[in-house]
């Protein structure tokens, strides 16, 4: 038996429609998009553009401003380094994934970029004030996660976007844990949205998206063949070409398209309700066990993620015991040094993350086994 509750890392299983779309894409799209005028290349180009349109419509963007990336980390690096290429001040939150924190820290160390970290609180107004208090005349970008990959806490990103809009500051949002689970649109005030294709969007690994409203220029961090302006040694200055050097993840893009269509057909509210119902049931069961620490605050809102610890047992040791029974959960520090520093965890946490295909019965059985582990200290 293997039960996957590590869907915050990548969703599994994938919808049947995604699996079928992948099989179909491998059979049909054997050309290279934008590289050739023959039938295979043209058919593949049309399919890639269709995937781009689907993603653009889903996030309220224009297709030409919708860029396929290798993953969310790639998209965030393009956005952060591209927007901050001329220097300036940037602000990130204290719950950021290393996909934001590391490129930001590297820029602050090596270039004319200064960095501030805004503390996140359970209370949204306190969090917004935390960001507001750090804004300077030189602030060029605010980068924050929509939802923490450790606890699932949803940041007041729409209010943070208002701060940015009033001051002409670029707002870059990390949607890896939110997109496909809650509705996220550029009309929320986001200038550049970066997300993964293989998590809530149900695509395959090796896929990500950068979606821009086109208001802030993004200097390319990589140059190469784009299928356009091939006679010039200069990188194209228009999207998506400026940020899509080399062959894009064509087959992966087909999977993301199918995943988005699955979400639209199923209903994003229904997906969230199912996953959050499982989380609330799991929390209810854990709350009955003495010595279980659950990292959720009543005042905050969350996507369907629950971080917890079993007494003083190191999180990775506890997770390994659960894995022996067939339960897949991520433990440790979740590539989020800042978040765990704020939480004050000594050995990280165990992260429970269901998907639309998860079962409340399996979650209840896991909670029951957690109780046995807590009481015995072993499986």
Per-region residue spans from a language model:
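Pyridoxal 5′-phosphate
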Residues: 1-379
């Amino acid at each position: 038996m293997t039960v996957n509750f590590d869907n915050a890392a990548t969703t599994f299983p994938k919808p049947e429609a995604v699996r079928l779309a992948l099989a179909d894409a491998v059979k049909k799209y054997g050309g290279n998009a934008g590289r050739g005028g023959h039938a295979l290349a043209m058919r593949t180009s049309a399919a890639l553009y269709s995937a781009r349109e689907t993603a653009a419509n889903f996030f309220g963007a224009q297709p030409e401003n919708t860029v396929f990336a290798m993953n969310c980390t790639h998209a965030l690096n393009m956005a952060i380094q591209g927007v901050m290429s001329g220097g300036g001040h940037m602000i990130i939150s204290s719950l950021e994934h290393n996909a934001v924190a590391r490129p930001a820290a590297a820029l602050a160390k090596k270039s004319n970029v200064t960095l501030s970290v805004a503390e996140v609180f359970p209370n949204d107004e306190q969090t917004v004030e935390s960001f507001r208090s750090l804004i300077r005349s030189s602030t060029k970008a605010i980068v924050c996660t929509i939802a923490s990959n450790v606890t699932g806490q949803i940041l007041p990103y729409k209010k943070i976007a208002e701060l940015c809009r009033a001051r002409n500051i670029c707002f870059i949002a990390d949607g890896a844990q939110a997109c496909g689970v809650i509705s996220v649109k550029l009309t929320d005030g986001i200038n550049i949205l970066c997300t993964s294709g293989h998590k809530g969007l149900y695509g395959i690994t090796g896929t990500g998206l950068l979606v821009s409203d086109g208001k802030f220029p993004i200097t390319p961090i990589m140059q190469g063949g784009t299928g356009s302006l091939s006679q010039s040694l200069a990188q194209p200055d228009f999207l998506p070409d400026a940020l899509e050097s080399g062959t894009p993840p064509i087959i992966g893009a087909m999977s993301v398209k199918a995943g988005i269509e699955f979400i639209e057909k199923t209903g994003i509210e229904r997906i969230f309700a199912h996953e959050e119902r499982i989380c609330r049931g799991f929390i209810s069961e854990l709350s009955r066990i003495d010595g279980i620490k659950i990292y959720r605050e009543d005042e905050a809102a969350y996507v369907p993620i629950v971080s917890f610890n079993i007494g003083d047992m190191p999180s990775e040791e506890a997770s390994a015991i659960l894995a022996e029974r067939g339960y897949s959960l991520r433990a440790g520090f979740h590539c989020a040094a800042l978040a765990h520093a704020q939480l004050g965890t000594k050995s990280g946490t165990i992260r429970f993350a269901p998907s639309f295909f998860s079962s409340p019965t399996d979650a209840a059985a896991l909670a029951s086994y957690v109780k046995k582990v807590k009481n015995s200290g072993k499986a």
